[in-house]
Amino acid sequence: MAAKVTDLRSALKMLEDMPGQLIETDVEVEPMAELSGVYRHVGAGGTVMRPTKEGPAMIFNNVKGHPGARVAIGVLASRTRVGALLECDPKDLGKKLYHSVDNPIPPVLTEEAAPCQEVVHKATDPDFDLYKLVPAPTNTPVDAGPYITLGMCYASHPDTGASDVTIHRLCIQGKDELSIFFTPGARHIGAMAERAEELGQRLPISISIGVDPAIEIGSCFEPPTTPMGYDELAVAGALRGEAVRLCKCLTVNECAIANAEYVIEGEVVPNVRVQEDQNSHTGYAMPEFPGYTGPASDQCWMIKVTAVTHRKNPIMQTCIGPSEEHVSMAGIPTEASIYGMVEKAMPGRLQNVYCASPGGGKYMAVLQFKKLTASDEDRQHFWHSLHSVS
């Protein structure tokens, strides 16, 4: 029987025991474009363009400029791997997530020593430097800078205290500065930052990197499935049958995922916006899941970093767009959301949902119906039209 997956390390151990699902290399790689380029050819079957191909996840043990650190990429870039990691038949992943949303297990705060705080670097240290502490790759030569693509951003609403976890676009801008992009009107932490700004306050935030895949998948839910006040860490708790463990941050009034590989602590600064490519001046941000390189934003918020903590010999986890990893993270929660909405409207009719790779997990869904009456045909067409318009 396979060992239980509780964090990134146990997830990688499971993949190691699955033939053809993980490649590890000790060859030195540059984090600037080379690491992602090697993965594209070896792990992504030669391309990350649509239609994407599946290949093994990779671990790079020798990243130039970052002794003792490793980088994992492509962990979720296969529905087969996601199914194994979540102990579910790949075709039933959407249904499993749907039931997890409806049966949440909220996270709990632990008082035990947190693995993510085995090594502590504070911004007040004279040699503190994000560029050196965090082996964040620059995926293409025109990227705005080194990106943290799988950071679990965790913050709490200034008024209600309700917490939320979300993945955001994070770019290293300086020794103790990150830019964060909030899609206008579409993200809970963005709304929290706006409210904190109205109050003239900084918003404490933690960014946990290298976590249980259940957390990464669960964090990709969006409203209305998970409205404001719903902590998506509770989805991961339901998927695992036990609560996600949080620890208190050391330098800000927020919590972080206790068994993460890295945690970046900081505060979102009010009334400050930065140009995303202020250091590279390329005009671009990074490759996005639909298949294009997005333009750099001039409306990114600024995070002032106060600390970086990590495990001993930490593993940085990253992804590159557009890839099957995005299809898994965006698509499977979307399947769950569609399944839930249609099930409420047409109980027992919808058999399954699949968000296919050509749509990047968001723009194409295949719905399997069980038609019991002639009128079901019209209902089916209605849902198809509604989804096409949206």
Regions found by a protein language model. Name each.
Residues 1-302, 306-390:
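Extended, highly charged
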